[in-house]
């Protein structure tokens, strides 16, 4: 969802209710898309707050994907959610059907301004405006051997966030991703 605060547009992803009705709605929408695009994937979200158990989400995703759909596993989204909701991302990955993963996304983010929340709490943001953090690189190396159907890796960076001279750092991240992927094969 998106809202405005003090003239700023703020986007905070809010998770779907993990109910059978939500599974049915998402599966129907994926089926509609699949009538146009032969291979449809669902990306895990970077949810900043959760009212339920965040480790229930992998089972919810597995039910949505079943045998027909695929997963775009965004490791920075997972890292963001794990930091903000306080859980072990490895426990999340252990529950997720990684045979459904066709793409892995890598990105970076930043920490929010403490003034955003009355509690002064900071959040990790999935802003795609920084280098891939070390925990995400470690997740990549950990998860690759368990993704037998992986077809692509995507390094994401928001347009306008690469300063002059930073292209070298971006290229190094791309080389690092390639090395990790090649080592896992």
What kind of feature is each model-predicted range?
Residues 1-2, 46-48, 77-79, 108-112, ...:
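Active-site-proximal loop/turn and secondary-structure-junction residues that shape catalytic pockets
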Residues 1-70:
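Active-site acidic/histidine proton-transfer and metal-coordination neighborhood
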Residues 13, 17-20, 81-149:
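Gly/Pro-rich active-site loop or hairpin
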Residues 26-34, 58-62, 93, 137-144, ...:
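Generic structural signal for well-ordered alpha-helices
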Residues 28-40, 67-69, 139-152, 180-184:
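A structural motif corresponding to the C-terminal end of an alpha-helix
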Residues 40-43, 69-73, 102-106, 151-156:
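Hydrophobic faces of well-ordered beta-strands that scaffold small-molecule active sites
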Residues 50-66, 81-94, 167:
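Distinct, well-ordered alpha-helical segments
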Residues 163-185:
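C-terminal helical cap(s) of enzyme catalytic domains, especially alpha/beta-barrels
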């Amino acid at each position: 969802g998106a809202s405005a605060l003090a003239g700023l547009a703020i986007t905070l992803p809010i998770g779907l209710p993990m109910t059978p009705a939500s599974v049915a709605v998402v599966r129907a929408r994926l089926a509609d898309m699949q009538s146009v695009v032969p291979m449809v994937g669902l990306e895990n979200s970077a949810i900043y707050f959760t009212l339920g158990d965040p480790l229930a989400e992998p089972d919810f995703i597995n039910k949505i994907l079943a045998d027909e759909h695929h997963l775009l596993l965004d490791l920075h989204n997972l890292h963001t959610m794990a930091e903000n909701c306080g859980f072990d991302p490895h426990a999340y990955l252990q529950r997720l059907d990684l045979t459904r993963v066709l793409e892995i996304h890598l990105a970076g983010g930043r920490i929010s301004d403490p003034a955003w929340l009355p509690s002064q709490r900071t959040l990790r943001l999935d802003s795609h405006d920084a280098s891939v953090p070390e925990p995400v690189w470690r997740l990549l190396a950990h998860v690759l051997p368990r993704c037998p159907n992986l077809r692509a890796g995507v390094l994401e960076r928001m347009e306008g966030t690469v300063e002059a001279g930073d292209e070298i750092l971006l290229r190094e991240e791309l080389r690092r991703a390639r090395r990790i992927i090649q080592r896992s094969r």
